[in-house]
Structure formats: structure tokens, C-alpha cells
Amino acid sequence: MYAGEFKQIGVTLNVRALKYSSKWYRWILPDLTWSIEEDEPRVYLTFDDGPHPEITPYVLDILDQHGFKASFFCIGDNVVKHPETYNEVLSRGHRVGNHTFNHLNGFQTNNSQYIDNVAKAAEVIDSTLFRPPYGRINDGQRGVVKKKYEIVMWDILTHDYSPRLNKSDCLQQITKLTKPGSIIVFHDSTKAQENLEYLLPKYCEFLAANKYISCQLP
């Protein structure tokens, strides 16, 4: 589970869980970026765990349909495996971020190994943005990473990776939570593919219909 995520008993993730699952984590880590102060109808779509040679291009095509830009937090190992897809993300005008080389859980990894893994990813991902996998990073790791990176979290986590997700309920809930400056997390990964292909087109249509645009993270 993601940091701060409530365990769900049933198959439906309710709006209260989506809204408050990271609230306590935001309270204890106010120095991380959870949303962007915005007066204009701008949001920040983000995608974790790619690049994937089939799913990432699908995402890029959906974004292009609406003229949206986004930020992709990439796993270094996937960049090495799929450099053409990674370069396509950049060539189509999107921003990238470091998501470690091997998708490490900071709560289960010693600090030295974690920092080395971030540095290994930096060899193939040129960025000043970092997002910890699962949202899990301890104090020691955070202190080192913050010297080189802005650590970007979220205020809307779609849970698209969950096989228990009720897709239609999730769509309704994430649209309710959307506000100017929201940072929204999707995943361009095999685990999330089915939910992503349902949610992303409809969510982008919602954004466009409500005069929102999606931009790269600043």
C-alpha cells in the first residue's frame, strides 16, 4: 500500500478514503510538494512506474488529444530497457522525474542502498524532481534526497493499480476532489493498465469540459 493509505474492506474505495488517505502524512511532512498553489484552472497529471513500451505511448496519445502536458516519474531500470519510449516522453514535451532505479520502498531499504539507487537512476534520468515509490521515504533518506531534488507527492491518488478498484466510483470521486493545483497520480504500468485505460480518457474529458488544463510540474 501507499504511505498513509487506509486498508479497504470492500471493493469500493470511497471518497473519504481518497481524500484523507495521505492527510496525516502531509501533516508530518509539510516540506514535500503535495499540490501547487494555483488561481488558474491548472492541474498536474503525473504518471509513475514507466516507461512501458505499450502503455506509455497510449498515455501520450490521450494527452495529445487534449493538448495536455504531464510529468512522468520513471523507474531507472525501465528507462534502460525502453530508451525509445523514454525519449518519446521527452520529445512530446513532457517532464520526467526520478522514481529510483528499482522501485524501492524506503521503509524497507537501508539508507545507503536507497540513496545509491536514486543516484543510479539519476545516471539515466536527468531531472530535479523525485517521487518516492509507494510514497515511502524515511527521514534520513529524505534529508539526502532533498539536497538535489524537489520531492513531489500528490493530493489525488487514483488507486489505478488496485485490482479491487471500482472504476466508475473512482472516476466520480477523483473528479470531486479535483481543484486548481491538484497533483494527480496515475501509473503507466501493466498492473494499472485496465483501470488506467478506463479512467484516463474520461478524466481528461472531465478536465477539458471544466476548462482545466494539465501542465508539467513547475
Name each region found by the language model.
Residues 28-31, 57, 79-90, 132-142, ...:
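Alpha-helical scaffolding within the catalytic cores
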Residues 50-54, 73-82, 104-112, 131-138, ...:
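Acidic-and-aromatic substrate-binding clefts and catalytic sites of carbohydrate-active enzymes
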Residues 60-69, 94-95, 101-104, 111-139, ...:
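CE4/NodB-like, metal-dependent polysaccharide N-deacetylase domain
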Residues 44-47, 55-80, 87-90, 94-100, ...:
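Short, well-structured secondary-structure segments
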Residues 1-45, 51-65, 81-82, 202-206, ...:
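N-terminal pre-catalytic segment of deacetylase/amide-hydrolase enzymes
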Residues 174-218:
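Catalytic grooves of carbohydrate-active enzymes
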Residues 6, 10-13, 136-175, 211-218:
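His/Asp/Glu-enriched short active-site or ligand-binding loop at hydrolase and phosphoryl-transfer sites
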Residues 47-49, 74-76, 98-100, 132-134, ...:
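A cross-domain feature marking catalytic cores of carbohydrate-active enzymes
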